[in-house]
UniProtKB/Swiss-Prot annotation:
EC number: 4.2.1.59
UniProt record, GO biological process: fatty acid biosynthetic process; lipid A biosynthetic process
Name of the featured protein: 3-hydroxyacyl-[acyl-carrier-protein] dehydratase FabZ
Catalytic-site annotation from UniProt: H55
PANTHER family listed in its UniProt record: 3-HYDROXYACYL-[ACYL-CARRIER-PROTEIN] DEHYDRATASE (PTHR30272:SF1)
Swiss-Prot/TrEMBL keywords: Cytoplasm, Lipid A biosynthesis, Lipid biosynthesis, Lipid metabolism, Lyase
Pfam (any one): FabA
A single GO cellular-component term on record: membrane
UniProt cross-references to InterPro entries, sorted A to Z: FabA_FabZ (IPR013114), FabZ (IPR010084), HotDog_dom_sf (IPR029069)
Entry annotated with the keyword Lipid metabolism: yes
Top-rank taxon: Bacteria
Family: Belongs to the thioester dehydratase family. FabZ subfamily.
Lyase found in the keyword field: yes
Length: 148
């Protein structure tokens, strides 16, 4: 029995799925995914990220809200790849619970974004999201998106 090849999504296709653009497109590549179940993506953190100008001068740390936004975008990609939308529908970030930050994300880091579907009901899909750097958890949260 052979292992299945990873299902990679490059930035060009990501931009067809998400409306975000620079400086708020926070997923560089999807490394693999399984519709309706999980997705693994990466965000490379450059010292040139616009947020580092003020967060914090001389001590650049990726703001936690941007880590959560990166997880939400990974969630959106999985939702778009899983569920069929009717004309004019989009997926919207609907909620976040139990967000915890465990380590800083710094320039030069490669942040791995892992999202997993918990359940889908009446147009609301719940996910777990975990962002890691070098295998260490940087952030974990429960996320929700709504189809509207």
């Amino acid at each position: 029995m052979s292992e299945q090849q990873p299902r990679v999504i490059e930035s060009k296709e990501i931009m067809t799925l998400l409306p975000h653009r620079y400086p708020f497109l926070l997923v560089d590549r999807v490394l693999d995914f399984k519709e309706g179940e999980w997705l693994k993506a990466i965000k490379n953190i450059s010292v040139n990220e616009p947020c580092f100008t003020g967060h914090f001068p001389g001590e650049p740390i990726l703001p936690g809200v941007l880590i959560l936004e990166a997880l939400a975008q990974a969630m959106g990609i999985l939702a778009f790849k899983t569920l069929e939308l009717k004309g004019g529908e989009l997926f919207y970030f609907a909620g976040i619970d139990e967000a915890r930050f465990k380590r800083p994300v710094l320039p030069g880091d490669q942040m791995e974004l892992n999202v997993q579907v918990i359940k889908e009901r009446r147009g609301i899909t719940s996910f777990t999201g975990v962002a890691t750097v070098n295998g260490e958890i940087a952030c974990e949260a429960k996320l929700m998106c709504a189809r509207r």
